[in-house]
Structures are given as C-alpha cells and as structure tokens.
Amino acid sequence: MTPLALIMIIIAYLLGSISSAVLICRLKGLPDPRTSGSHNPGATNVFRIGGRSAAGLVLLCDILKGMLPVWGGYFLEINPFMLGIIAISACLGHMYPLFFHFKGGKGVATALGALAPIGLDLTGMLFGCWVVTVLVTGYSSLASMITALLAPLFTWLVKPQYTLPVAMLSCLIVLKHHENIKRFFEGKETKIWQRKRD
C-alpha cells in the first residue's frame, strides 16, 4: 500500500462519516432518523419520515460520499484493488460514522456512488436491478440485498479486475442488512412506501 492510497482511504472514511441523513433532517426540522421510523439514517427512512425532497437530498449526498474519493483515487492512478478498498472505506464511514457515534446507515447509496466510476453500464445495471426489485416486491431492503449479491457478477461482466473488492463490499452490505433479513422472515419488514410499524 502506497502512502497516497492510505491517505485516500482515510479521506474516504472521514467523508463517509458525514451523516447526510442526520444533517439534512436537522436542517429541515425533521425527527432524527436514528430514533424515528426504522431508526436507519438513510434515504429510505428519511423518505418515510420527511418525504421526497429530503430523501432526494440525502440520496444525492450519500452517492457523492462514495463517488468523490473513488474518482479521486482513479485520477491519481491508484490500482484497481486499492480503489476497491477506498470504496469500502467510504461505505464503512457511512455505516460506522466517526462523527455520529458510529451509528450509520446500510451503505447502499454510498456503494452505488463508489461503483459509479467503474462505468455507467455497471451503474445502470445496479440501479435497474434495484428499481425492478422494488417495483416487483415493494421492499427497499430486499432490492438492496439482491442488487448487492448480483453486483460482483455485473462487475465481472464489465470490468473483471474490480470483481474482488466489489464482492467484499457486497458482503459488507448484506451483513449490514441482518436485521432486515430477520424482520423479513418474521413478516415484520416494512415496504418502502409504508411507515415503520411501532
């Protein structure tokens, strides 16, 4: 690992640690997403408690948190594997943010942003997979997990040199959804357009 790669990994984690869901909810006078709805500081929960406008801003910021450090590493000619580690670091920052007591989101939007520099074709496949699954099932969490599981295959078809780090990132996202998996099998998981059941 080069010093430059290490610096980018640290920057990615710190950038990921900025919880846009919490900050945007504060700015808009909305409840704290960590204690409201599904208690997840992510775009889906903000959509439930604050509507489209707030959720759209959170989604955009979360995507940029992943995209910017990976783009930076790409232009600095950091090798593909280390770019993957930078992407994982940004997602770890989102999931376990230093600035917000390590209570973060699931990392899906940040992961999408981190994978976007690989190519628009991959981004389109991932986004399309998520949208289709949501439209068919109504579950954002299920769509995220299915998309994460298919991401290594899509990556292998587009740019195989990134497959290993993408697979590592996919495992991280699925593991972060363990509570959703439990609720799904208990019949308690909430669909994207429903408010969280108390």
Curated annotation (Swiss-Prot):
Top enzyme category: transferase
Pathway entry: Lipid metabolism; phospholipid metabolism
Pfam families linked: G3P_acyltransf
TM region positions: 4-24, 53-75, 80-102, 112-132, 134-154
Subcellular location: Cell inner membrane
GO molecular function: acyl-phosphate glycerol-3-phosphate acyltransferase activity
Keyword annotations of the record: Cell inner membrane, Cell membrane, Lipid biosynthesis, Lipid metabolism, Membrane, Phospholipid biosynthesis, Phospholipid metabolism, Transferase, Transmembrane, Transmembrane helix
Primary location recorded for the protein, binned into one broad class: membrane
EC number from the UniProt entry: 2.3.1.275
Membrane topology category: Multi-pass membrane protein
One GO location term (cellular component): plasma membrane
GO terms classed as biological process: phospholipid biosynthetic process
InterPro entries cross-referenced by the UniProt entry: G3P_acylTferase_PlsY
Reactions mediated catalytically: an acyl phosphate + sn-glycerol 3-phosphate = a 1-acyl-sn-glycero-3-phosphate + phosphate
Similarity field: Belongs to the PlsY family.
Matches recorded under NCBIfam families: glycerol-3-phosphate 1-O-acyltransferase PlsY (TIGR00023)
SUBUNIT field: Probably interacts with PlsX.
Annotated function: Catalyzes the transfer of an acyl group from acyl-phosphate (acyl-PO(4)) to glycerol-3-phosphate (G3P) to form lysophosphatidic acid (LPA). This enzyme utilizes acyl-phosphate as fatty acyl donor, but not acyl-CoA or acyl-ACP.
This protein's name: Glycerol-3-phosphate acyltransferase
Source species taxonomy: Bacteria, Pseudomonadati, Pseudomonadota, Gammaproteobacteria, Vibrionales
